[in-house]
Amino acid sequence: MDAAATKPHAGGGPSLVGEGSFACVFHPPPRCFTQEHPLSKRSDADKPLGIGKVFERNGDAIEEWAIIKAIAKLDPKQAYFIYPLSQCTVLESAVRTRPNARGCSLLGHSAPNPSREYIMLKMPTARETSVAYVDSHRKRLTIPELLRGMIPVARGLERLARAKIIHHDLKQDNVMWLSAQEGFRLIDFGLAIPMGNAFDPNKNWTLAANYFLHPPEYRMFHQWGRAPRSAALASMEYEEDRHLLAQIAVLPKRTLLDEITSRYLPADQQHAQWTAFHDALASKPTLADARAFAQRYATRIDTYAFGLLLVALAARLSQATAPEGFYRFVGRMISPDPRVRPSPAAVCKWIVASAAKAPRQAPPPPPSNPRRPRHAKQKRP
């Protein structure tokens, strides 16, 4: 880090405090806990300049704890998705944004700094993960109440879809419980990618990661990114490589998790829907056509992971009485055919409507015969 970046800006503005590339950008300068109080013992050896490094800090004005995380380098190749992401109020509403010199935005109390190579995210410290909260309240929590808490997550996914961004890491550890008023909150945008790069192996390395929360159609493209190409094929346009397109015929037709029960989506429907999409994708003459066909439904990639999350959490509840249409709608969310899945806007609308059916807990009634205080007693005449 250069010396100019480590001293306060002119006019007493924000300064960088910390060690090396793990510095925080805040005013007044916060304490960055790197070695003394590590928040998470995670390996950052494979991430340049500590991208993904997690810090714990104290609030600027009030005594509150917040999470600070570097998510991206501000270079022309990696910063193109940051601006629309910052416009989505998926994080807490208290986060303020200011545009920097490159036309992007920085999340947090930061000032323009064109030389900065990363940005910092400020997030509130959560009470529990979604699984921990459901496990601790499993005896009295109902599915409609669970859906009510998921409304902020559904709205966040809808905003991301409008901004043409895929969260790409919607798992149980990234949905945190804040409070009864705020519900669950979606966090961790370290794997977020532009929607247009979803099926491009050169821009989406997670196609080959084979994560369980990724939709089944990813399995049809991940081999193309890893298959070796000869010098003759390398000189051709990758999108027109018919040799790689032919590999689709040998991929399996059943890729859903075994944990998904038949009450959400019967096995025969799983096979029929997967076969229909498989045949539609394999019938495309070129890889470019197949990619364009799958790209039409990229907005529903997060829908699949969100459906898996609802399945996992609902299975942990003791009071598993679901509202009408719950299993049928979630079965559409986890369909192997993205054409069957609802859009994020439809998911948000359905969750809001289903949560409205949950009776809100009324405050406890006052005692029927309250005892009068001693000082209120009156003497007999």
Range-by-range predicted roles:
Residues 161-179:
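Catalytic-loop of the protein kinase fold
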